Amino acid sequence: MISEAPPFWWRKADWRAWLLAPLSFLYGRIAGHRMAHARRASVSVPVICVGNFTVGGAGKTPTALTLARAAKAKGLKPGFLSRGYGGSLDVTTVVDPLHHRAVAVGDEPLLLAQEALTVISRRRLDGARRLVAEGADLIIMDDGFQSARLAIDYALLVIDATRGLGNGHIVPAGPVRAPIRQQLRSATALLKVGGGNAADGIVRMAARAAKPYFTASLKVRGDDRLSGIKVLAFAGIADPAKFFRTVESRGAEIAVAKTFGDHEHLTEEEIDDILTTAERQDLLIVTTSKDFVRLSGHHGKAEQLAQKARVIEVDIVFEDHLAPGLIIDRAIIACRDRRLKELKTS
């Protein structure tokens, strides 16, 4: 998986995109063939995949959290399935947020584990089976739409309304993971997050393909306003600009903005620079939930930064508040149909 998306991916296609187009054609053929012909193994519970069309953040993790809360409201025991990207463990593991650190299991699984049972596994089928063994009656898979070898009952593709598909090219010329038409064929529905019109084209394509789509927005949790406060904002996520816009929407004045690589663990020197700059300029330090969990469990400067930083937490809020429950219900029905079909053909 590519963790660092070149900036030109998110602008109108230029000479770099066209230069890489032959490689994109080859990559797209391979990715499309895998999606169309991959054998997907089955588990006994519904599987919802929260994915996206492109490399980088679109809001998958907060969407997965929203779906888990909807599942729990229905009396279900959801379980999250993740590859544990950014973590060092390469064995199937139940994530314990009280004992594991992001360096071992990845930052996103640590966030997910605070909400529900979470398993990381390089082989998603093994992870899904472990979740079932642990009592999960619904699996929410964070990413893996294009590559997982696991039967999916409901594939919800999240797209950011501000970034859309970027320059529209497939990796490495652009951020798109596989041919769009192939992705749409395999998708159940789309979720457009935020304002802007960059996603309008793909939404129209989805409508022509008879795929439903939902809309949602990112909402800052709580009533914590930052009006008139000067801050140092730092983020090591796929789209730090989105975080900075969120901070400014709370009324803060960003005096210093620092960006790091997605899933990147800060060095002692980087942490010291943040602390020193904030103290020298009398700035409040603000960061994301993912950056915060990467600091958690450490000592020294990292612990000091974790104590000083204010975390700006965001939730995905569906425009139709019944939509998350509807998605859960549709996944359950699809799972029943899948299981009946398997019984008839066995």
UniProtKB/Swiss-Prot annotation:
Sample GO molecular function, one term: ATP binding
Top EC class for this record: transferase
GO cellular-component term (any): plasma membrane
Pathway where this protein functions: Glycolipid biosynthesis; lipid IV(A) biosynthesis; lipid IV(A) from (3R)-3-hydroxytetradecanoyl-[acyl-carrier-protein] and UDP-N-acetyl-alpha-D-glucosamine: step 6/6
List of residues binding ATP: 54-61
Positions in coiled-coil regions: none
GO biological process: lipid A biosynthetic process; lipopolysaccharide core region biosynthetic process
Family: Belongs to the LpxK family.
Protein name: Tetraacyldisaccharide 4'-kinase
Source organism of this protein record: Rhizobium etli (strain ATCC 51251 / DSM 11541 / JCM 21823 / NBRC 15573 / CFN 42)
